[in-house]
Design a protein with these regions (language model features):
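Short glycine-enriched loop/turn motifs at secondary-structure junctions
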Residues: 2-4, 55-59, 99-100
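Short, flexible helix/strand-to-coil boundary loops that buttress conserved ligand/catalytic motifs
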Residues: 22, 75, 120
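Conserved beta-strand in the GNAT
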Residues: 48-51, 107, 116-119
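N-terminal beta-strand motif that seeds the catalytic metal site of vicinal oxygen chelate
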Residues: 1-16, 61-62, 122-128
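Core segments of cupin and vicinal oxygen chelate
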Residues: 2, 9-48, 52-55
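Hydrophobic pocket/interface hotspot
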Residues: 18, 22, 62, 78
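Residue-level marker for the onset of beta-strands and adjacent loop->beta junctions
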Residues: 6, 36, 60, 102-104
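Vicinal oxygen chelate
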Residues: 64-111, 115, 123-127
Length: 128
């Protein structure tokens, strides 16, 4: 069976600003609007389709697997933007990165309150 994630909808109060935020942090470009969405396509073909809502937004979590070099670049953008970041999903280790499974990882939030994460090794893939 060949099943792949194609896209997910990301709720935002300002879809353009939220899509641009993700694109800027990851070094990507938003795609042209498609219906009510502003998609941001990541290199494996999956799109995060930003859609505006007036209601409350329940924060979701989106984790991105990146290379060691890309981690350095993205982490620099996070720091340059003055974003708060954490080594853990509970926000107990502010200003730190983690080294889970022999890699590096960090959590931060987008303007809509969604939890974003960059990791260099999939969790459960190596040494703790």
């Amino acid at each position: 069976m060949n099943v792949q994630l194609n896209h997910t909808i990301v709720a935002a109060h300002d879809k353009k600003a939220s899509a641009q935020f993700l694109a800027d942090i990851l070094g990507l470009e938003p795609s042209p609007p498609f219906g009510p969405f502003i998609p941001v396509q990541i290199p494996n073909g999956v799109t995060l389709d930003y859609m505006e809502t007036d209601g409350d937004i329940t924060p979701q979590h989106y984790a991105f697997l990146v290379s060691e070099d890309d981690f350095d670049t993205i982490f620099s953008r996070i720091q340059d933007a003055g974003l708060t970041y954490w080594a853990d999903p509970y926000h107990h280790r502010s200003g730190e990165i983690n080294h889970n499974d022999g890699g590096r990882g960090v959590y931060f939030q987008d303007p809509g309150g969604h939890y974003l994460e960059i990791i260099t090794r999939p969790y459960g893939s190596g040494v703790g």
